[in-house]
Amino acid sequence: MARVTVEDCIDKVENRFELVLLASHRARLISQGASITIDRDNDKNPVVALREIADETLSPDDLKEDLIHSLQKHVEVDEPEPDPASMIAAGGVAAADGEEQDDVPETITFDQMSEEELLAGIEGLVPPEKSDDY
């Protein structure tokens, strides 16, 4: 990588570590087929990514947001929590209607399994096929 390119990027992204993260993420996107916003000039993907950041054809904030989303494994959806007052009112209405609430067991019971049944179940398991991942 050209030192000039990195020094041009420091003006846009002050932290060198963050610059490396953003440029490497952008280089991976380019290698996966994302369109580039500048002329390639026979440069490799990391250099193209740095030149895009230096020329401000991509916003560092947008790259950072995209990097964060790519690293998230579980995206939490904000759902409104039920209002406790409405739940109490709904429970009170159901009890007032005379519905029997005997359907709900008071204690939770689990299936009991003997040691022999457990061992037979374990012996019946099929081991997964080996892959080249590890």
From Swiss-Prot:
Enzyme class at the top of the EC tree: transferase
Catalytic activity: RNA(n) + a ribonucleoside 5'-triphosphate = RNA(n+1) + diphosphate
One GO MF term attached to the UniProt entry: DNA-directed RNA polymerase activity
GO biological process: DNA-templated transcription
Keyword Ribosomal protein: no
UniProt entry tagged with the keyword Flavoprotein: no
GO CC list: DNA-directed RNA polymerase complex
Swiss-Prot/TrEMBL keywords: DNA-directed RNA polymerase, Nucleotidyltransferase, Transcription, Transferase
EC number: 2.7.7.6
Self-association and partners: The RNAP catalytic core consists of 2 alpha, 1 beta, 1 beta' and 1 omega subunit. When a sigma factor is associated with the core the holoenzyme is formed, which can initiate transcription.
HAMAP family: RNApol_bact_RpoZ
Family from the record: Belongs to the RNA polymerase subunit omega family.
Purpose of the protein: Promotes RNA polymerase assembly. Latches the N- and C-terminal regions of the beta' subunit thereby facilitating its interaction with the beta and alpha subunits.
Name of the molecule in the record: DNA-directed RNA polymerase subunit omega
Source organism of the structure: Rhizobium johnstonii (strain DSM 114642 / LMG 32736 / 3841)
Biological classification of the source: Bacteria, Pseudomonadati, Pseudomonadota, Alphaproteobacteria, Hyphomicrobiales
